[in-house]
């Protein structure tokens, strides 16, 4: 792997490093049951596939899709409860990184590249995932939309690059927002479409990516 083409890797989290569905789906169903029990929302529960479809979206988009017609108060409560239920699921040992992620990050880090996370997720969740799997130390910076109050991935990545003086590198993700953020900020975009795992986007979302990978380990050779 050569530094001639970049100095840093900026990773999305959900669907890129972490198998989000193993935590977010059961956590959401816990949240939905609590909302119904408290009389805060009586709509039908979304299917697992509908829950998966919101991964990577900003909070407004998430709740408009999963709880259409819900009050702002109910959406705020649901957002807080879902976060807590996700953290509880992580504490219970749920969830997994994609194969090769932990070793791959270590290899890239040891070769002198700076690693970052840029996620639309909430900060406690993002940091909770990285901490639960012991990979926080590989990252120079961890950027989440909520913590930075920047609910646009193009701007979130731009802020990250400005604050850490990143002039070139790679954007690695699985959604169209990752492709757009990378392109908008002059990064080489690597789209993740892992073979044998659920995809949270349709095939068109990664159009425009410079490279596509079917496993995380491919990143070690493609970025060279």
Language model regions located:
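Acidic, Mg2+-coordinating phosphoryl-transfer loop and its flanking beta/alpha structural elements
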Residues: 171-211
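Glycine-rich phosphate-binding loop signature in dinucleotide/nucleotide-binding domains
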Residues: 2-4, 110-113, 163-167
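N-terminal helical cap/lid subdomain that shapes the substrate entry/recognition surface
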Residues: 4-99
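A short, structured active-site edge motif that brings together acidic residues
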Residues: 51, 135-151
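Conserved Lys-Pro-Asp/Glu-containing loop-to-beta segment of HAD-superfamily phosphomonoesterases
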Residues: 152-179
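Conserved phosphate-coupling serine/threonine residues in phosphotransfer and NTP-handling enzymes
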Residues: 16, 119-121
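Short, acidic loop-to-helix structural element flanking the phosphoryl-transfer center
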Residues: 88-117, 127, 154
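Surface-exposed amphipathic alpha-helices with a cationic face
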Residues: 102-110, 161, 179-183
């Amino acid at each position: 792997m050569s530094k001639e083409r970049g100095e840093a890797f900026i990773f999305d989290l959900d669907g890129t490093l972490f198998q989000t569905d193993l935590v977010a789906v059961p956590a959401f169903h816990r949240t939905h049951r609590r909302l119904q029990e408290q009389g805060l929302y009586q709509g039908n529960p979304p299917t697992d596939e509908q829950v998966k479809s919101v991964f990577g979206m900003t909070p407004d988009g998430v709740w408009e899709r999963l709880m259409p017609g819900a009050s702002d108060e109910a959406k705020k409560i649901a957002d807080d409860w879902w976060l807590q239920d996700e953290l509880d699921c992580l504490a219970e040992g749920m969830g997994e990184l994609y194969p090769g992620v932990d070793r791959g990050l270590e290899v890239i880090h040891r070769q002198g590249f700076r690693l970052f996370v840029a996620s639309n997720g909430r900060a406690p969740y993002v940091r909770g995932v990285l901490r639960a799997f012991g990979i926080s130390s590989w990252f120079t910076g961890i950027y989440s939309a909520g913590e930075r109050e920047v609910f646009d991935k193009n701007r979130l990545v731009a802020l990250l690059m400005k604050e850490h003086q990143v002039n070139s590198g790679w954007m690695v993700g699985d959604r169209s927002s990752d492709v757009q953020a990378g392109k908008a900020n002059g990064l080489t975009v690597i789209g993740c479409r892992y073979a044998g795992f659920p995809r949270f986007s349709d095939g068109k979302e990664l159009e425009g990516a410079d490279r596509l990978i079917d496993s995380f380990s491919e990143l070690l050779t493609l970025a060279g």
